[in-house]
Design a protein with these regions (language model features):
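Conserved phosphate-coupling serine/threonine residues in phosphotransfer and NTP-handling enzymes
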Residues: 10, 118-120
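Short, well-structured alpha-helical patches and their helix-loop capping segments
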Residues: 92-95, 117, 150-154
Length: 228
């Protein structure tokens, strides 16, 4: 893709190593409220704003408890959020995926802005950024979280806000990079010029192939072949 002005990256599984900690914490948050959700179903909602993902799973597996949702959803989310914050602040092995920081620097050197967006809240995101030293010395031009816009993915609001912050007006000059189905949907809904999936996170290559992103890459440095 020529003439790209902004590349928007997902975080966990795309630019930050995730060894299954997010889905595990999600499952445990439900279990702590005596709710059992199959792991394969949690896998499917990775990438969504977490309060939305919780509601989706409750509607599928516990529709008979709908009257309790106003209490259950924030309670499960609070448990998940605190678990993730504690995990990320304590996890000394947390690291960027190979090539992420070098890629940010490369794009900056050729005048392309970079940004991060995520289904996490700002509280969790700041814990990740702090652990990676990305909060004190940010390698990207902007970061936005799902609780800072009216709706999370697949709505286009996070990408649109990042465009505003980075001074980009044409979504055709924006590249979206992520590891989940909802990343692809978000990129399509924002009318991004290029939607790229990576196999380093929640979805396998075969799963991603069925979702028809513009490109599927095995590592971030493969982006250099797509964006000039």
């Amino acid at each position: 893709m020529q003439h790209a002005k902004l590349v928007v990256f997902d975080m966990a599984g795309t630019t930050v190593v995730d060894k299954g900690s997010v889905s595990s914490a999600f499952i445990q948050a439900f279990l702590s409220h005596e709710l059992d959700i199959p792991a394969e179903e949690v896998h499917k909602v990775m990438g969504y704003r977490k309060v939305d993902a919780i509601r989706m799973l409750l509607e599928r597996y516990y529709p008979d408890r709908k009257d309790e949702y106003p209490v259950l959803i924030p309670a499960i989310h609070h448990t998940f959020e605190q678990s993730m914050v504690d995990f990320y602040l304590a996890d000394t092995s947390l690291a960027p995926l190979p090539g992420a920081e070098e890629l940010f620097k490369h794009f900056k050197s050729i005048g392309i802005k970079t940004a991060l967006n995520t289904g996490f809240t700002r509280k969790i995101t700041d814990a990740i950024l702090h652990r990676l030293n990305w909060k004190e010395s940010s390698p990207v031009d902007a970061v936005i979280c799902s609780d800072e816009v009216p709706e999370g993915r697949p709505a286009p609001f996070m990408i649109q806000e990042l465009m505003r912050q980075c001074g980009v007006t044409d979504p055709g000059q924006v590249v979206k990079v992520g590891d989940t189905e909802v990343d692809i949907q978000e990129g399509r809904n924002a009318k991004c010029g290029l939607v790229v999936s990576v196999t380093t996170g929640a979805y396998s290559r075969n799963e991603l192939l069925a979702l028809k992103p513009d490109h599927i890459i095995n590592s971030l440095d493969n982006l250099l072949l797509l964006i000039h």
